[in-house]
Design a protein with these regions (language model features):
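Charge-rich, low-complexity segments
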Residues: 1-96
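C-terminal accessory nucleic-acid interaction domains of nucleic acid-metabolism proteins
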Residues: 1-27, 37, 41-42, 98-118, ...
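Short beta-strand
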Residues: 48-51, 152-158, 203-207
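A generic structural signal for beta-strand entry/edge sites
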Residues: 69, 81-83, 116-118, 161, ...
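Signature for HUH/AEP ssDNA processing cores
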Residues: 83-158, 168-180, 292
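A short beta-strand motif that forms the metal-chelation/ATP-contact edge
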Residues: 162-169, 213-217
Length: 292
C-alpha cells in the first residue's frame, strides 16, 4: 500500500529519540501483525485516530465511515452502520494510513459479536499511586481468578495501569451471554473490593478513588472495548500495550519501557501470550461459584 504523507510526524521525538512518522507506524504494524491479529481479527474494532499526530485532533472511530479502505472488513453488529476489523497485515497498514494509532476491539469470539470470549479487569490507579501498587493489585486479581478455576493473563495498557485478561470458551455448551460476562466481572471486582476496601474501589467517579485502584469491570459488556495487546497508544512516549508473563510483574517493572522505539527487540522475544487461546476454560462453573 502506498502511504500518503509518509513523513508526517505522529509522535514527537523524546529524550534524544527521533520522531515517529506514519511510515514508522506502518512498519510497526507490518512487523507486529502476527502478534496483533489474533486479538483484533474478525472483531469489531474501535480506532483512535490522530491524522495530524498526537498533538492534533484525536477522535474515537467506532463505525465504518464513507470511503473506508477496502482492506478493512466490515462487521455487522446489528446497528445502522457496521464496525470495521483488520483481518490481515494490509488492514493494519490501512488503519495506520488513516492515522489510526490505537486498536480497541470487542472482547468477542472472532466472527460472532454476540459471544464474549474474554474478560478484562482494568486496574486504573488513582493519581499519586506508585506503579508497584498496581503490580500488587494485579496479583490479587490473579489469585482470585485462579481460585475460580480460570487462567489470567496480564498486559500493560501503554499508560499507568495493567489489564488482567481471562480467556473463556465459546463452544455451544460453554458460551455465556454478554450480561453474564459483565455480571461475573462485576461480582469478582466487588468481592476483591470488599476484602480490601482501603486498596480498591469499583466506583467510576474520580472523587471516590482517593488513593485506591479502580477495578474497572465495565469493559465486559456488549459494545465495550479494551485496548488490544501490542496496540500503540496515542500519548507522549509512544507506549505499546504490552503482553507480559506473570514473572515480569514485579517491583521495578517500567511500563514505559515498551514503546515504538524498541519494538524490534521486543518482537524477538517469545510471546508471553502464545498460549492465550489454549488456556480457555468454561466460565459457567465460576459463575455458579459466584452465585450467578
Amino acid at each position: 500500500m502506498t502511504l500518503s504523507s509518509p513523513d508526517k510526524v505522529l509522535w514527537p521525538g523524546r529524550e534524544g529519540r527521533p520522531p515517529i512518522t506514519k511510515a514508522d507506524l506502518a512498519r510497526y504494524y507490518e512487523a507486529a501483525a502476527e502478534r496483533i491479529l489474533p486479538h483484533v481479527g474478525e472483531r469489531p474494532t474501535s480506532i483512535i485516530r490522530a491524522p495530524d499526530g498526537i498533538g492534533g485532533e484525536t477522535f474515537f472511530q467506532r463505525h465504518a465511515m464513507a470511503g473506508s479502505n477496502p482492506r478493512l472488513k466490515l462487521i455487522d453488529v446489528k446497528a445502522r452502520t457496521p464496525y470495521v476489523s483488520a483481518v490481515d497485515v494490509g488492514g493494519l497498514v490501512a488503519i495506520g494510513q488513516s492515522g489510526g494509532l490505537e486498536l480497541h476491539p470487542w472482547g468477542c469470539k472472532p466472527g460472532d459479536p454476540e459471544v464474549p470470549d474474554q474478560i478484562t479487569f482494568d486496574l486504573d490507579p488513582d493519581e499519586g499511586l506508585d506503579f508497584n501498587d498496581v503490580i500488587a493489585a494485579a496479583k490479587v486479581v490473579r489469585r482470585k481468578i485462579e481460585d475460580l478455576g480460570l487462567t489470567p493473563f496480564v498486559k500493560t495498557t501503554g499508560g499507568k495501569g495493567l489489564h488482567v485478561v481471562v480467556p473463556i470458551r465459546t463452544d455451544a455448551r460453554s458460551r455465556v451471554s454478554w450480561e453474564q460476562n459483565k455480571a461475573f466481572a462485576k461480582a469478582v471486582s466487588e468481592a476483591i473490593r470488599v476484602e480490601a476496601p482501603d486498596r480498591f474501589t469499583t466506583t467510576l467517579a474520580k472523587k471516590a478513588r482517593g488513593g485506591k485502584i479502580f477495578l474497572d469491570y465495565l469493559r465486559n459488556g456488549r459494545m465495550a472495548t479494551a485496548v488490544a495487546p501490542w496496540s500503540p497508544r496515542a500519548r507522549p512516549g509512544a507506549g505499546v500495550a504490552f503482553p507480559l508473563s506473570w514473572g515480569q510483574v514485579k517491583a521495578g517493572l517500567d511500563p514505559s519501557a515498551f514503546n515504538l522505539w524498541n519494538y524490534e527487540a521486543l518482537l524477538k522475544k517469545p510471546d508471553p501470550w502464545k498460549d492465550f487461546r489454549t488456556a480457555e476454560a468454561s466460565l459457567k462453573p465460576a459463575l455458579k461459584r459466584m452465585g450467578l
